Amino acid sequence: MRRSAAPSQVQGKSFKKTRFIPPGRSNADVSKEITKMSPDPKLFQGAEQSQNDPGVCSSNPCPSEGIPREVGDGTRVDPLPPVHSASKEITESKAQEEEASSLLKYFSVVWCKASKKKHKKWEGDAILIVRGRSFTLKDLEGKDIGRGIGYKFKDLENVEEGQTLIIGGKEIEILGTISSDDFNSGKCFQHGSGSPAVPSSQAARKCFSNPFKSVCQSTQAQGKRWNDCRPRHNPCTPNALVMPRPDENHQRMFNRHCSPIVDVVIDPHLVHHLRPHQKDGIIFLYECVMGMRAVGKCGAILADEMGLGKTLQCISLIWTLQCQGPYGGKPVIKKTLIVTPGSLVNNWRKEFQKWLGSERIKIFTVDQDHKVEEFINSTFHSVLIISYEMLLRSLDQIKTIPFGLLICDEGHRLKNSSIKTTTALSSLSCEKTVILTGTPVQNDLQEFFALVDFVNPGILGSLSSYRKIYEEPIIISREPSSSKEERELGERRATELTRLTGRFILRRTQEVINKYLPPKIENVVFCRPGALQIELYRKLLRSQSVRFCLQGLLENSAHLICIGALKKLCNHPCLLFSSVKGKEFSSSCEENEERNLCQGLLSVFPAGYNPLQFSEEESGKLQVLVKLLAVIHELRPTEKVILVSNYRQTLNVLEEVCKRHGYACARLDGQTPVSQRQHIVDSFNSKYSTDFIFLLSSKAGGVGLNLIGGSHLILYDIDWNPATDIQAMSRVWRDGQKHPVHIYRLLTTGTIEEKIYQRQISKQGLSGAVVDLTRSSEHIQFSVEELKNLFTLHESSHCVTHDLLDCECTGEKGHTEDASEGPVASRQCQFGPQKSDALRPLSMSQLKQWKHFSGDHLNLPDPFLERIRENVSFFFQNITNQAPAV
């Protein structure tokens, strides 16, 4: 007996899988009647005669149903029941199935666990995907939470708003339809998509009106005060840079005292030095930190490439916000915190002094002699500049300071939300946040999410939803084996991610300032390995540790040890010798693994080998470097060289080479005191400097430094992270450079360095998919399969990277002969315009458009390359701002 007055089934009619009913009538009596009837030959004979007899009337060729008829000898026969054509029914059902399979609809729904309760308690929003005869239910994080299959096409076609369904143990109610564009772009997964509405409490808020009006106090005082609210600078003067005025929604949220709107004008002293792209950047930053671009969010990422003046744009923003405001002219902030790498603390102080002098604004830099407590007790310092390391030490004191603006220079180091630095900065109660970085996407899209979530928490949802909705479709679409549907979905998701983040991320490339800079000649130089290097490389690849790594029998640390040993060998065998000798009598587990890797290597070295008295001929890259330094010193005696490495031990070798050849050099690495670094840089940039070479550690000083005193930069080794190398190479080609810039990247041919370089290109393509999406060109993408082969020595190739390009140019000796032998079977690992119609990602170097030269090429156009060709197997060259003579 039913106890509830509720209907036994929800009005929406939950779908149930019905019993199968064959086509046609299913009346039992009719079927028996048909079975009992025996076929009469006369019946068919009469039918044939009626068809062939021209005298028979054709107006009614078939007898009517239910009317008795005579056949042959006049016998009356009962009417035949209507029999449906089986072939027609099957054809119609197949057509319906095909139509159902092509059916694809999307709905926004609410869901809860299936129950018989009359009043449902919905647990959350979801997306219903109707595909063919199946349902898929996804939550707003992109996870599948329910599936159903086997529904009728008629039921699927009639799904409408307000209907309730049961799917996978969950009851849902249809709220509305979603367009395919919104689903493919991912907009439907966004919480509160569209322009955020102003809360009713804020929209209804009015200015406080005191009901009692004093007869002694005149209202003229307040009116006079408001009349005195004038812009700090005249907005009507020529070339005045005026910030946008807040709209009505912004005024409801932030102008609680109904103050008059005042124009915010950038100081004309700064505007005089600003370039057009810098003016646009200041307006962008102002709108972001004031909450005008993303309602309720006051963060921004200035992702301009190196050399575009991010520091000057931030200084202009700070000075403006500390002096002006749109509501009654009241300053927006009082104090600013700038967090930067240790080597750039004094550089920021110099930039403030350069653009604003020492009287307009007071800057406090934290170092060993100046503590945070002094800033707390100071009444006239308004900007605190501190390194990331000192921030962690002084976090408790900094938390007590009410900063209105936080600026994180070289903010790509915040790519991991779980590290101490990111956690410490997130604990500060500072609503307005700006990240400065030239490389917003370094390795993967999760690092990009960490940066975005730091400046504007929650704007992309949770990390799990971000992975499902954006990261996975984008990465899958960039694989060479992806389907057309996957590529289209990934492209739409990347476009939507760019649109979302474009509200608070500004990215400009160096193309905007090319006209202000001298020519830049970039060269990727592939150096032939020395005989000792080849012999040691073979020995390492045959070692037990490498074989176990390839079989997956060792832990991850063993992989890193093998890679580290190969990288040391590529720089110089003496570095590997010192490492092997140092681990010979070690006892720790990690050092035992390295000792096992290097067993038998000492026997390959010459007897009595001394790493301190190394030979330049033992390393292919070192031979090229020595010749390159000699030709630069000969042809450009007044120009200087920056020599960059990732490792201090390698810098020691390079410093010894400089001493042998009598080159005066300066050095900046991790052991250089922070207080002395800016002085070393200034001395090298001075025209009175006698140093020919600047030895630079990319880890300690590869970011933010301005080394325009040198015009030749040589990157001796390569890093897994492309941002490290890009930052280091950007130290010389920037504002203030007077000479043509020459950049050389040295790689050992056929070794692990080429594989690392190829992975760098792949990672840069990922950055282009999101941040630089507006660029369009035919670019190459290396397959994952080609990049897995790290532990291989390609001795017969002049350049493995050029081989992967599938380029038919004559740069490589014998390449055209190989290409003319016949068509080669297409594989997923091959590249070129003819291989795939997919939208290829943007690469760092656009190698297809670069010039390709073999080391055996006759008459190289570059005089520097011509002199070092003896030890080089291949060149890639690209010239920016090409001039008649470089």
Swiss-Prot record:
Family, as annotated: Belongs to the SNF2/RAD54 helicase family.
The encoding gene: Rad54b
EC number(s) from the headed UniProt entry: 3.6.4.-
This protein's UniProt keywords: ATP-binding, DNA damage, DNA repair, DNA-binding, Helicase, Hydrolase, Nucleotide-binding, Nucleus, Phosphoprotein
Motif position, DEGH box: 409-412
Signal peptide: none
Protein's recorded name: DNA repair and recombination protein RAD54B
Compartment list: Nucleus
GO cellular component, one term: nucleus
Organism: Mus musculus
Sections of the chain in a coiled coil: none
Keyword Hydrolase: yes
